[in-house]
């Protein structure tokens, strides 16, 4: 590597293997004169769609069942059943023939913007069965697709023409049910819009903790917060495990309530729900606003 003085920049030539693009990630480690590691950078090589495709295949398959009652549509395959509300288009329940029901429900709801339910329809796409709801307002549609292998796919579209601190969708899931989480993405630390450095792309796993700034006992890294560039995340709960994967790049996941200040309400308020999948997150300085000044540039 070249000799680079402090505050200067330069180029490093990396002698990579001819087939390096076939790998999932690229790691670069900087070592000091004493031979000790200074830092390791990591970059995703394959796109998110290619990475997600490697975890989707499941050997067992059954025909997809679509059943309708007075309240819900139910989509079932390979022992997995999803219940979709006929009045809202939202997920209202998840069931598994081999374990207890999951309390992951009431989504996707917009964390910012308006949505007014218009209609819902059912359909088929090859071996898959579909429930699709349309909306007026900022949310355009929600489409649920059940595959024969039991994977439930969610597609949605929204458009917000406003200055908002965060954008995306949320679900409900009780924080008290969580045991641990495992994910492929940046970690192990949480991030903010203006604090994106200091995390490394890898597969991470950590036990649930409720560490908050200024309140002991401290158990770091914090379990709750905004996490960046997530490809998949596995929730390990008292009800069992479930996995959420995406082929979208640059997805943020928000885990639960992580504001540690009491008294005045922080700004901005956390997104609705307990677990969020976001395209934008707020800056850290805004959490000190307390309704007085919400300018992150002033507050830090």
Language model: regions and residue ranges:
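Carbohydrate-binding surfaces of carbohydrate-active enzymes
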Residues: 1-83
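Beta-strand/loop-rich accessory regions of lumenal/periplasmic or secreted enzymes
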Residues: 19, 50-300
């Amino acid at each position: 590597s070249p000799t680079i003085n402090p505050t200067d920049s330069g180029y490093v030539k990396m002698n990579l293997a001819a087939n390096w693009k076939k790998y999932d990630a690229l790691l670069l480690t900087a070592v000091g004169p004493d031979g000790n590691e200074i830092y390791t950078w990591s970059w995703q090589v394959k796109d998110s769609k290619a990475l997600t495709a490697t975890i989707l295949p499941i050997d067992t398959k059954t025909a997809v069942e679509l059943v309708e009652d007075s309240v819900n549509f139910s989509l079932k395959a390979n022992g997995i059943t999803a219940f979709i509300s006929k009045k809202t288009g939202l997920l209202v329940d998840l069931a598994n023939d081999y374990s207890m029901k999951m309390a992951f429900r009431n989504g996707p709801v917009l964390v910012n913007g308006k949505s007014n339910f218009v209609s819902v329809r059912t359909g088929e796409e090859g071996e898959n069965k579909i429930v699709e709801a349309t909306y007026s307002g900022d949310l355009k549609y929600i489409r649920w697709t059940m595959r024969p292998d039991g994977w439930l796919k969610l597609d949605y579209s929204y458009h917000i023409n406003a200055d908002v601190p965060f954008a995306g969708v949320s679900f409900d899931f009780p924080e008290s049910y969580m045991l641990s989480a495992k994910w492929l993405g940046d970690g192990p630390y949480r991030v903010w819009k203006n604090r994106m450095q200091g995390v490394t792309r890898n597969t991470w796993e950590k036990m649930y903790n409720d560490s908050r700034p200024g309140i002991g006992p401290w158990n770091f890294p914090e379990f709750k917060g905004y996490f960046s560039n997530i490809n998949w995340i596995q929730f390990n709960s008292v009800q069992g495990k479930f996995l959420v994967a995406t082929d979208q790049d640059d997805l943020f996941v928000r885990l639960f309530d992580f504001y540690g200040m009491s008294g005045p309400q922080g700004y901005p308020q956390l997104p609705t729900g307990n677990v969020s999948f976001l395209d934008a997150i707020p800056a850290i300085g805004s959490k000190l606003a307390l309704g007085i000044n919400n300018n992150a540039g002033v507050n830090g």
